[in-house]
């Protein structure tokens, strides 16, 4: 398979046919079409918005129909990326975008009897750092915050960072304007914890309207999945009929959040683990949020420590809850919908909130990649192992990716080495990454 990048809908039928014939001549049996704006200058995107940002419009589907027509004559299978860019979302997502918990805090010395109003809440630190790496990944800070909990904790000094103990949910003491507290002797903190939208934009989306905003869905709530299917999936099925792709492809997720959240998480956590997560929420925050773009640089250091491994135990339960929701609220409903049209799901599970082995396993074609985790043998084995235990005959990998400003530096020996590494790790289908539609700007 070759991944075929289009500059949105800035394409023409003559060039489409020319490039499909080139794929056939190069012995590719299938083509995956992915519309992207990555690599195009921002000024060019703004100037040519009407030509590029037309994915999902009538003229885009006319070009897709032409792809199917030519591919049928050439005996080439066509896969379609589910949407434009990654992760799943678009400018049409209004009701159920990706959510997070954020916090503000007040330090208090006791003993004291005090009245405190919630301090101002500001944009988390991970946002600017993430946007420095990938421009405009996170959009404007969502000021429409919802107070979810107020937690009171005692602080114990430590050379390795503050320890939180005696955590209590004191939300019930809040009168809507302020909270009145009897503070015992010692150093304490009061945490105001809010839910809001991450404002995470789908990276590289060429969907109509994406130039300004293209929100990623809440992958932990099936209402987000349903919004995506209703506003994108069903439209695509209708517009490309009677054609259909061999596979719908869902790219890696790279989900982001200060503390990734969903409205369903409180209840799901209680049901799964038999206790409330609320008092322990301050322990779950990390200094740089949860951003895959930052982990390699800053690591995953937590903001606070605990005694008796409380933080580690609660965080593990939180992860299990998140994995459960990701599987049952997004992956399975999406797969079932795709399969209902006799189309297969090709899935890169990494970067999401699921257990990777379980997530890869539900795909019809589990797919790894040679960029995530540096394309290490062990990482590639995650997809192939999951495919083997779930009896999947095809296990693919997005291959021949090189982090380099000169992409022509790959020589034949590099292709042989990278392909050999994939095959030795159990990959049996190479996705060539990739071929860019010939576009002059």
Model-assigned labels for residue ranges:
Residues 11, 15-17, 22-26, 30, ...:
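Mature extracytoplasmic enzyme cores
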Residues 1-6, 49-53, 205-219, 311-323, ...:
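Glycine- and acidic
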Residues 9-23, 229-237, 349-356, 379, ...:
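Short, acidic/polar
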Residues 29, 33-74, 81, 109-121, ...:
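Aromatic/His-enriched, Gly/Pro-containing loop or helix-boundary segments
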Residues 15-38, 63-70, 243, 337, ...:
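Catalytic domains of carbohydrate-active enzymes, especially glycoside hydrolases
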Residues 1-54, 357, 366:
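N-terminal-proximal low-complexity accessory segments that begin disordered
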Residues 90, 249, 341-441:
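Hydrophobic targeting/anchoring helices
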Residues 1, 26-31, 72-79, 242-246, ...:
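Loop/turn elements at helix/coil->beta-strand transitions in domains of secreted/extracellular proteins
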């Amino acid at each position: 398979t070759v991944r075929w990048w289009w500059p949105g809908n800035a394409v023409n039928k003559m060039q489409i046919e020319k490039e499909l014939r080139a794929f056939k001549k190069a012995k590719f049996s299938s083509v995956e079409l992915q519309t992207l704006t990555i690599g195009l200058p921002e000024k060019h995107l703004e100037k040519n918005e009407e030509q590029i940002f037309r994915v999902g419009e009538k003229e885009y589907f006319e070009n897709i129909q032409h792809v199917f027509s030519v591919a049928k004559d050439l005996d080439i299978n066509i896969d379609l990326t589910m949407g434009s860019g990654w992760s799943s979302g678009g400018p049409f997502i209004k009701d159920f975008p990706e959510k997070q918990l954020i916090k503000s805090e007040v330090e208090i010395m006791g003993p004291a009897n005090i009245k405190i109003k919630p301090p101002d809440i500001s944009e988390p630190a991970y946002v600017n750092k993430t946007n420095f790496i990938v421009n405009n990944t996170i959009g404007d800070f969502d000021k429409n915050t919802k107070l979810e909990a107020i937690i009171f904790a005692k602080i114990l000094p430590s050379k390795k960072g503050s320890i939180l103990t005696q955590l209590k949910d004191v939300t019930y003491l809040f009168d809507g304007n302020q909270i009145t507290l009897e503070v015992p002797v010692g150093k304490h903190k009061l945490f105001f914890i809010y839910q809001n939208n991450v404002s995470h934009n789908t990276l590289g989306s060429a969907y109509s309207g994406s130039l300004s905003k293209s929100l990623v869905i809440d992958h932990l709530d099936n209402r987000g999945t349903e919004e995506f299917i209703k506003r994108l999936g069903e439209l695509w099925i209708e517009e490309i009929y009677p054609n259909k792709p061999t596979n719908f492809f869902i790219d890696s997720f790279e989900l982001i959040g200060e503390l990734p959240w969903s409205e369903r998480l409180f209840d799901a956590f209680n049901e799964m683990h038999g206790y409330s997560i609320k008092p322990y929420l301050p322990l779950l925050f990390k200094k740089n949020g949860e951003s895959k773009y930052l982990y390699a640089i800053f690591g995953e250091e937590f903001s606070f420590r605990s005694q008796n491994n409380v933080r580690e135990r609660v965080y593990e339960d939180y992860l299990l809850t998140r994995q459960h929701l990701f599987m049952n609220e997004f992956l399975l409903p999406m797969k079932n919908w795709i399969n209902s049209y006799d189309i297969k799901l090709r899935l890169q599970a990494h970067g999401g909130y699921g257990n990777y082995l379980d997530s890869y396993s539900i795909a019809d074609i589990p797919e790894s990649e040679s960029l995530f985790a540096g394309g290490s043998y062990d990482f590639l084995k995650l997809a192939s192992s999951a495919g083997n235990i779930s009896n999947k005959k095809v296990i693919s990998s997005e291959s021949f990716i090189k982090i380099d400003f000169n992409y022509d530096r790959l020589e034949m020996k590099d292709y042989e080495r990278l392909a050999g590494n994939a095959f030795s790790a159990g990959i049996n289908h190479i996705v060539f990454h990739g071929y860019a539609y010939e576009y002059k700007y």
